């Protein structure tokens, strides 16, 4: 039973683990969608409620598994209690039997004691009779004492045997009583343990009831959360419909704004043409007056040649206007040059910071172009945190080709900032989930507003530049229009500076996070390099030790081979010596046998 409970407890957490994995995957997908399309507070609230629901469901599952385990343990304890109660009943029955046996034995002991007392009294009476008999024998002639004492001694022996048997029975009964007392003590202990287990079971039942109440409360909370979720879903649907309507209205307003701006541009072009025509008329009048004066003065003498005062005043006024216009143009050009130089310096500094931040992690540099491609292939609505779509909508008649380089640099910086943001999301998670999405939604809104303002400012600058080009050909402007232009340019520069400062702050934060991530990666790489160096040192030491051992083994093998060769040489020498000895022995024996035979033949010859 306990093994089954443990298996249930071990298998139960697998479901929540899978749910956690799915929750993390869904959260990552929601964060990616929030990054691409912006985040709404309603969506954030919905995700939070869904997370709470999942947590409650997980807690419910855990509580149910605990309840099942407790129920199984309760059943096991109930079975154990039932078994203990059965054993207790059996022990009580045995106790009753032993008590009845003890009572019967006690009665028998009392009877034996009474019989013993009676036997002692009979013994005393017999002794008294013996004394009387002895006294009577002295007086009278009586039968022999042995005849009287024999039956009495036989009775005494029988009584003593019965007394010994009764004493043995008493000892056995004492042993049985001691055993029963020990069994009673064990039974009392088991009863106490059973009572403690029963108390534990009662406590567990109380805990189960509390858990059931908590489960009911959780069910009610889940129902309330379901209702709230349904309400939030309905509100989200309504809000999504209103958002769609507002988007359609914004699109319509953008189209109308584009049309209005086209008309304004056309009117401005017509006004510029009118001003150029007026300038050309003034120049034509001046030239005509000069020609008329020249023609009129041809027939006069050199002393009589005079220019009329009106013509001289008109020419003077015309030249003063052109000089003032040129001065205003010089001032505007100086201002634009200064602002462009400042912007150039700022952009160069920011590009250096970006390059320093992007050069650090090689993985980040390899990921950036792929992400840029995905952004360029995808919808260009939030390419620069919500403002690129409005930029593309504001130029339906081919105005994208006429934009200034500052706008191009701004759009490239915004796209690079979005890429850096996305890369920083993958490398360093330095912000929390909910606050990050809310901050990003705020940043998207502000960035879109500021970039829309910057696009309007760029278009105003373009119209001003075109107007200046036409004025270089010969337009005359008043000082009020010049002051208005300077005010517009300062406002546009301020808006551009606001956008650049906003992007600079964002990029600076991302650069700091990237530098931190790079520093952490460098530290991890250094640690890995140190570990690799340590392993390489260990490998070198092991290889050296292996080489030393191999050299030792080779030396030992060479020594063994030398010893074996020496042993072989010794054996060969011994074999050769034995062979030589055997060959010498055979030769000497042959010589001796030959000499013996010759001597014998000589002796025989001499004998003959």
Swiss-Prot record:
It comes from Oryza sativa subsp. japonica. Belongs to the MAP70 family. Residues 363-379, 476-493 have a biased composition (Polar residues). Its main location: cytoplasm. Residues 40-346, 542-576 form a coiled coil. The gene is MAP70.3. The lineage of its organism: Eukaryota, Viridiplantae, Streptophyta, Embryophyta, Tracheophyta. This is Microtubule-associated protein 70-3. It comes from the Eukaryota. It is found in: Cytoplasm, Cytoskeleton. Residues 1-23, 354-493, 570-608 are annotated as: Disordered.
């Amino acid at each position: 039973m306990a093994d089954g409970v443990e298996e249930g407890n071990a298998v139960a957490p697998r479901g929540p683990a899978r749910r956690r994995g799915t929750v993390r995957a869904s959260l990552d997908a929601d964060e990616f969608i929030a990054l691409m399309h912006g985040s709404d507070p309603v969506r954030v609230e919905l995700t939070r409620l869904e997370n709470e629901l999942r947590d409650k469901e997980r807690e419910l599952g855990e509580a149910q598994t605990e309840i099942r385990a407790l129920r199984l343990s309760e059943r096991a304890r109930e079975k154990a209690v039932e078994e203990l109660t059965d054993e207790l009943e059996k022990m009580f029955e045995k106790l009753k039997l032993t008590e009845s046996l003890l009572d019967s034995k006690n009665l028998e002991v009392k009877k034996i004691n009474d019989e013993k007392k009676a036997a002692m009294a009979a013994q005393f009476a017999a002794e008294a009779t013996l004394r009387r008999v002895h006294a009577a024998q002295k007086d009278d002639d009586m039968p022999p004492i042995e005849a009287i004492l024999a039956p009495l001694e036989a009775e005494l022996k029988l009584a003593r045997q019965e007394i010994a048997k009764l004493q043995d029975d008493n000892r056995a009964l004492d042993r049985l009583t001691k055993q029963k007392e020990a069994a009673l003590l064990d039974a009392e202990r088991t009863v106490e343990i059973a009572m403690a287990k029963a108390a534990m079971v009662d406590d567990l039942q109380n805990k189960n009831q509390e858990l059931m109440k908590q489960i009911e409360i959780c069910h009610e909370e889940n129902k309330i959360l379901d209702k709230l979720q349904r309400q939030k879903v309905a509100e989200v649907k309504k809000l999504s419909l209103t958002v769609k309507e507002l988007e359609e209205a914004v699109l319509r307003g953008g189209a109308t704004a584009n049309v209005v701006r086209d008309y304004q541009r056309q009117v401005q072009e017509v006004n510029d043409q009118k001003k150029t025509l007026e300038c050309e008329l003034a120049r034509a009048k001046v030239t005509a007056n000069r020609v008329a004066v020249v023609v009129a003065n041809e027939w006069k003498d050199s002393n009589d040649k005079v220019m009329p005062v009106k013509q001289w005043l008109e020419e003077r006024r015309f030249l003063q206007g052109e000089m003032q216009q040129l001065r205003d143009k010089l001032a505007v050009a100086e201002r634009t040059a200064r602002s462009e130089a400042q912007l150039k310096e700022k952009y160069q500094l920011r590009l250096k910071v970006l390059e320093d931040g992007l050069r650090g992690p090689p993985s980040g540099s390899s990921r950036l172009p792929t992400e840029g491609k995905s952004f360029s292939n995808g919808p260009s609505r939030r390419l620069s945190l919500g403002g690129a779509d409005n930029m593309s909508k504001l130029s339906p008649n081919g105005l994208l080709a006429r934009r200034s380089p500052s706008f191009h640099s701004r759009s490239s910086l915004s796209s690079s900032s979005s890429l850096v943001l996305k890369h920083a999301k993958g490398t360093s998670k330095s912000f929390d989930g909910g606050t990050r999405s809310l901050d990003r939604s705020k940043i998207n809104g502000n960035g879109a507003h500021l970039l829309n303002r910057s696009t309007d400012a760029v278009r105003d600058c373009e119209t001003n530049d075109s107007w200046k080009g036409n004025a270089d050909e010969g337009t005359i402007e008043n000082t009020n229009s010049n002051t208005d232009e300077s005010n517009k340019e300062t406002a546009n520069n301020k808006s551009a500076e606001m956008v650049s400062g906003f992007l600079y702050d964002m990029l600076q934060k991302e650069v700091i996070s990237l530098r931190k991530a790079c520093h952490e990666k460098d530290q991890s790489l250094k640690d890995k390099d140190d570990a690799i160096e340590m392993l390489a040192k260990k490998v070198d030491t092991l290889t050296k030790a292996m080489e030393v051992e191999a050299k030792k083994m080779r030396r030992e093998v060479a020594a063994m081979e030398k010893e074996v060769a020496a042993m072989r040489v010794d054996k060969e020498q011994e074999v050769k010596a034995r062979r030589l000895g055997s060959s010498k022995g055979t030769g000497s024996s042959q010589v001796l046998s030959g000499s013996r035979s010759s001597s014998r033949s000589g002796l025989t010859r001499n004998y003959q």
